[in-house]
Amino acid sequence: MVDIATTGKPQLVVLSGPRRVGKTFLLRHLIQAIGPGISAVYFEANQAAEVAQLRRFGEVLAPALDPEDAALLQPFANWEHALNFCAATARTRPLLIVIDEVTYLMGSTTGFASIVQTVWDRIAPLANAPSLVIVLAGSATAMIEDTLSYSGALYQRPTQVIRLSPFTAAEAYAYCGRPEPEALFEAYAACGGYPLHLDAWDFGQSARENLLQLAGSPGGLLLEDAVILLDRLPDPQSRILLAIGQGRSRRSEIANEVGSRLERPLDSCLRTGFVCAIKPIGSPRKARRQYRIADTYLRFWIRILADHVQRIEGGQGEEVISHTHGEWQNQLGSVFEQAAREHAIGLVRSGVLPTGTLIDEWWTTSGEQIQVDVLGLLDHRSVVIGEAKWQKQPLGTSDAAGLWRALRYVPDPIPEPTFILWGRGGVRQDATTSHLLGFGPAEMLAY
């Protein structure tokens, strides 16, 4: 982003991502990293009225201006006035304006995105365009995506759109300083890929001790954050998330649980990245989809904490953590399976698996229920079949036999596909062959 801000050309950048993903940290780092030849302003919007927001913006802007420009600064009548003033000052000195939580301005100022569009359409085409960089950042990702859509005010206006997502397990491993791999998976299963959550996890303590402190104590970060998130979502999005997290995976099941129409609110949940729609890899485009909570932390909270918040706040956190141990192990298993798929994608990138192989999960939709954690398709044929197990004992030949059984069901397998086992305790060497690969947590997180 520093490169974007120092081109000398007008730039309109949109940065979106969920709360706690690190947007504000990144933006403040950008402000600090800008060289002395550029004036930089960081403004964090809030839920105040437009007049109050404009006054605060002027107060933040003034110290960044040259004395001559600061002397011209008057109270802004509206946001078009404010942005036009910024464009005028950027003609003599490059100016970076960062507006964080911009969706609050969209709520307090009717047509705020259209105002940005008007100012941008006026200055961007000019041969002597001002060196103004505007960065709009926000956590209400569905609202931002609406603004960027075909019918939105900023359709095709930004010079760059950056969508921040939570860390993958491998990225979290690097961020946390490469702790013991098994401990990382435990932290990730509870914290998800959010830097603030991971920073709070103490790798010098056991998983249970961390869970008691962060999730099983009144006011614990992992207990409270999801409550805040769900409270901020419009109804019925929060009820949709709870229904999906509690196992309602089909549209009809979700509708019955929520008791209202799903089209728009479910679409918003998908666009925020909290929910994903999945189907077996290789299935027809019109195949019925299932819905799943895509956010690891939110899935942890709904799966383990949602039904017990009052008990934890009443001081029964230790009992709750003990009572939900089975669900905790299921959460670890699903996180480990997703990490195996991400690792397989890395193996394709590095050339260990055939170039062009598509990786995802697969299951039968009728007849005998068969689930394959990792299936790789190349030209519509199954070339990779894998299974991931969160168990202490190293995986062996009996686990490999399960892959051979799955071979009878997967789509059009080649004669000698590559089998892969991923195990929490690794894979026994006598189980591996030239066509059966085995990996443990350390190898999975190295990608």
What annotation goes with each model-predicted range?
Residues 13-16, 104-151:
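Sensor-1/coupling segment of RecA-like P-loop NTPase cores
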Residues 40-41, 46-70, 300:
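Conserved NTP-binding/hydrolysis module of P-loop NTPases
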